[in-house]
Amino acid sequence: MRLTQLKLAGFKSFVDPTVIPVPSQLVGVVGPNGCGKSNIIDAVRWVLGEAKASELRGESMQDVIFNGSGNRKPAARASVEMVFDNSEGRAAGQWSTYSEIAVRRVLTRDGTSSYYVNNQQVRRRDIHDIFLGTGLGARGYAIIGQGMINRLIEARPEELRVFLEEAAGVSRYKERRRETENRLSDTRENLTRVEDILRELGSQLEKLEAQAEVARQYRELQADGEKKQFALWLLKETGARDERQRKSQEMAQAQTNLEAAIANLRSGEAELESRRQAHYAAGDAVHAAQGQLYEANAQVSRLEAEIRHVVDSRNRLQARREQLQQQIAEWDAQQTHCVEQIAQAEDDLATGAARTEEARALAEEAHASLPAVEARVRDAAASRDEMRSSLARVEQNLALAAQTQRDADRQLQNLEQRRERLQQELRELHAPDPVRLEQLAGDRAAGEDQLEEAQQELAALEARVPEADAERSRAQAAAQQDAQNLARLEARLAALVKLQEDVQKQGALEPWLAKHELAGLGRLWQKLHIEPGWENALEAVLRERMAALEVRNLDWSRAFAEDAPPARLAFYQMPAAAPTPAAPQGLTPLASLLRITDPDLRTLLNDWLGNIYTAPDLGQALAARATLPAGAACVVPAGHLVDAHSVRFYAPDSEQAGLLARQQEIENLQREIKAQQLIADQARAAVARAESAWQQVSQAVAPARQRVAEITRRVHDIQLEHSRLQQQAEQSGERAARLRQDLEEISAHEEDLRATREEAEARFEALDAELAEHQSRFADAEIAGEDLAAQAEAARARLRELERAAQEAEFAERGVQSRIADLQRNRQLAADQSQRAAVELEQLQADLADLDASASQAGLQDALEVRAEREEALSRARQELDNLSALLRGADEERMQQERALEPLRARITELQLQEQAARLAEEQFTEQLNAREVDREALAQELAAMPDEWRRANWLQSEVGRISRQIDSLGSVNLAALDELNASRERKEFLDSQQQDLLTAIDTLEDAIRKIDRETRELLQATFDTVNGHFGELFPKLFGGGEAKLTMTGDEILDAGVQVMAQPPGKRNSTIHLLSGGEKALTATALVFALFKLNPAPFCLLDEVDAPLDDANTERYANLVSSMSEQTQFLFISHNKIAMQMAKQLVGVTMQEQGVSRIVAVDIDSAVQMAAEAA
């Protein structure tokens, strides 16, 4: 591939779209410092995938986008494109078929970076793959930037090895090996996970097998329990149906009796209704008489109100007449007063008009004399301003002369200080100590050894972290399992305690016990403990005595003869302690199995259980009948009793069955929970220890990493110090020459400044005298101007005083006119008010004449007579109503007696309805339960008919259901999906076994692949090392005119060893390359780069001022070598050296005529020479 064009747009200083042609094998880039030449090298690195901003001389990747200038706005994006001629098909991969390849990268302000190949968007990895093994890349040896020559020759052996690998083309092998190692690591992790899963699955299979057996037992018990439960429901459904029918018949008879009683009630209600109608008629008569009385009272009240109104109106009109007469007199007096004040105001108005005319004349005279005075003041001010301007010019010139003197003095002082600094710097300037350089080289070697040791320690710690983490996970899993076991036991205990508490709530006895204040007494079973397994036997023998209540004296129970308990209840009195009687030979008394410490209680139970013995099973109990004493019985653990003449099978027949067994299980569970809590605490402690160990290892990794980073920084700092000292030696001579030149320039500048100061001092003295004269004239003008200003101010004050007097006189005249108008309005108002009051007084006289109360007095007497007659009629009507009310109350009491007789009948019907409803609800409940389970009643009835007789007894079925329920409860928590989970786990184990074998095979295959890659890489690296070493040995003498150079390995294993450069120029026997000068290092690095090129020529090479440290002779040899190598490789170089420019076939000039914007000018050297020859 050959580079033909480089296109830039918005990249750093190349804001405008710019095309840099590369038509030949040697293209030089020239231009002044800072014009943007090195930006071309940065652009090539950037488009090849450089992701580190510092390698592009920036702080962030956004810095590559043009950031604006004085006349330009910032660019929105940066774009760089490289165009290659691929006519020979040397490109890798799918791009080998294209004759031209264009690689482009675009970065926008939002941080989006995109790569394109022939306008197809690709990944950064794809760009890397195109140039893999060619030496091209963001960090490849084909791009040599400023300072890279020194970094290359002074690189550590591990860093130099990278260039050798790139030249050998083993990058693709390393990439393949890295991918293979990643796959191998993933495969091993997968294998570890599979093995962990298999171990866990093995333990899980053992648990599932046990759980599957429990699930099988559970399903068998559940099927048997469901069958008996269905039979129980069917029997109860039939019983509830029969009960409902009986209650329905009784309810019909009670309804008939109720209807007969209701008929008698209706007859009495009819008689009551007739009497109530008569009572209503009498009440209406009373209301009518009451209404007539109300009308008479209203008429009396109306007439009395009319009389009172006439009297009140006459009094009110007489008071108003007196008030109007007084107001008329007051208004007449006010009219007289207003006429007198109007006459006085008219006299004042005439006097005020004369004073106003006089004040106006004086103000006009003062106003006419004021302009002349103000004109003299303005003339004096203008003269004074002219003098002030002249004075200011003189002062400005004087200040300028003084400033010139001060500036000259300050510059002379600064030059003196600068001379002292430069002389001090010249005295202190010295070259670095060579011993220090040797010491730094030794320190670097020691630091590298420490770094290797720290890296090994870090690797060991990082390997321990997964082990500690796995141990922590195992401890956490164990602790979680123990916690689950503890939770299971606690849940079982809580359920049993709740059940025990529910049973202890006494049921039907609870109200009776509370009524007799016996609810707080403890039950006997709470004090009993027996050997495990014999709980049912003890309950079968004691029966209701299990829940007996202790009393001090049994005679106290006589009080319950009239109010007996609603359910079975026993009381006991504690006897005195007595010795335990001896048992017959070969028989074990049931009382001997009790674990009781109270001797009185043991005496009581010995009495109750005195003739009860034990046998392990029913067969042995039957066999022991012959040995039983008279009246004795033998009991088995299930509770069945055998005596000499009978066998009694035991079944729980109350809700309190199993109390003793549950109590003992509760106590056992409490002990198990305490033990399990200790186990759980130990497991949590183990988790804490594992967590602590993991944290210690994890925390130790960070300091180890920090130590590795610290040693790496220290070695890097030593390298930087070494490079700095070498550069300081080269720069010290140049700096001394510049200092001497600066001192000479300072002396010449001091002479010029002294002459300038003397000239400014003479001018200052002349201007000082002129300033004194101007200041004297200006002071006189100031005094004269102040006198004129005082005269003008006095005239203006006199004018203002006269104008104010004229204005006040005018205001007084207007005030008198306003007062006259107000008095005239008040006089007219008084006249109007007096006239209105006279009219109103005349109307009042007429109203008083019209008022007369004699007619109302006569009507009032007639109304009082009518009211007396109507009061008597109302009294007669009320007496009739009271008689009828007494009859109505008698009839109503009789009706109420009949209604009360209905209440017992209705209560009976309600009771029967509730009983019928209860039976119906019970029937519906059992029917719903049977329907919900989709039970076939006919088939179940037929099946029950074929069963033994006990299947048709509800008590037996109830006990069987309870027994099966207890057996199911004894199984504990049941995993019903255990069978399915067991089958799924077995299938999963078979799959994981197969997967484990596949992973083992894959690991062997990947390890073989890594060994093969290592073998091929080792062979290729060795061949490359030998070839590059030979080329290096050939090119070094060409560049130096003699001497020798070679490459050496730092270790025996070529896959891990670094590469060191050994170079000795002609006539030198230096032991290390760091003792060479800067120019010698540059030539050595150039020889090494070109040796790499001869092995694996890159498509093109970029050189950025590589010849800067070379003298003319070395530059010429460097140029000859580049020219000879350009036959194989295309060179694009940046240089300020004329000798290097001469070898270029084309020159690309970079300019910056517009500040901050780079532009190019391309020149073909051969064409230029031909044009010059033709012009000559």
Swiss-Prot record:
Occurrences of domain SMC hinge (ranges): 521-623
SMART domains recorded: SMC_hinge
Keywords in alphabetical order: ATP-binding, Coiled coil, Cytoplasm, DNA-binding, Nucleotide-binding
A matching Pfam family: SMC_N
Domain of life: Bacteria
Keyword set includes ATP-binding: yes
Cell compartment(s), UniProt: Cytoplasm
Domain topic, free-text comment: Contains large globular domains required for ATP hydrolysis at each terminus and a third globular domain forming a flexible SMC hinge near the middle of the molecule. These domains are separated by coiled-coil structures.
Assembly mode: Homodimer.
Functional summary from the UniProt entry: Required for chromosome condensation and partitioning.
Name this polypeptide is given: Chromosome partition protein Smc
Organism annotation: Bordetella petrii (strain ATCC BAA-461 / DSM 12804 / CCUG 43448)
